[in-house]
Regions:
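A loop-to-helix transmembrane entry motif
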Residues: 35-53
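Juxtamembrane "helix-exit" motif on the non-cytosolic side of transmembrane helices
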Residues: 62-66, 87-96
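Aromatic-anchored segments of alpha-helical transmembrane domains
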Residues: 8-12, 80-89
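Transmembrane alpha-helix/helix-exit interface in multi-pass inner-membrane proteins
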Residues: 7-24
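Non-cytosolic membrane-interface motifs at loop->transmembrane helix junctions
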Residues: 93-109
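Perimembrane loop-to-helix junctions flanking transmembrane segments
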Residues: 23-38
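Membrane-interfacial loop-to-transmembrane alpha-helix junctions, especially the N-terminal start
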Residues: 1, 70-78, 127
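Terminal transmembrane helical module of multi-pass membrane proteins
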Residues: 112-127
Length: 127
């Protein structure tokens, strides 16, 4: 499924870029939220692996029930989450970090248009 590939590529970008941007993000966060605790690189990457697996499981279930309202609703819900994920953390973080934040390239170039397409697309009629 296309959305799973988008999530996989996006989370891979985040996982690879996080170690390099973590110090800058921590320094920036200290100005506003001094008590914030950032995950270690390993914690962050493991969270991405678990999140990717969970999304894959939900998408596999949704694909098997795509003609049912609950499968289509699950797909629309995930697309909404990924659309919000572009708007809320990635774009503002990239601006605050001077132009790049982990995941912003795939968020804007892949997740944004794909999420909008899924949300606009109509459910297939039941057979």
């Amino acid at each position: 499924m296309l959305l799973f590939l988008a999530v996989l590529v996006h989370n891979a970008e985040e996982g690879v870029a996080y170690p390099f941007s973590r110090p800058d993000a921590m320094q920036l966060a200290q100005l506003t939220w001094p008590a914030v605790q950032f995950p270690t690189v390993i914690e962050f990457q493991m969270a991405l692996v678990l999140l990717t697996a969970a999304v894959g499981a939900v998408l596999a279930w949704a694909a098997n029930t795509r003609r049912e309202p609950q499968g289509w609703l699950a797909l629309k819900l995930l697309a909404s989450v990924f659309l919000a994920n572009v708007i809320v953390p990635h774009v503002p973080a990239a601006i605050l970090l001077g132009g790049y934040a982990p995941g912003v390239i795939t968020a804007v170039a892949i997740n944004l248009p794909l999420s909008l397409w899924i949300l606009k697309h109509r459910r297939e009629p039941s057979s």
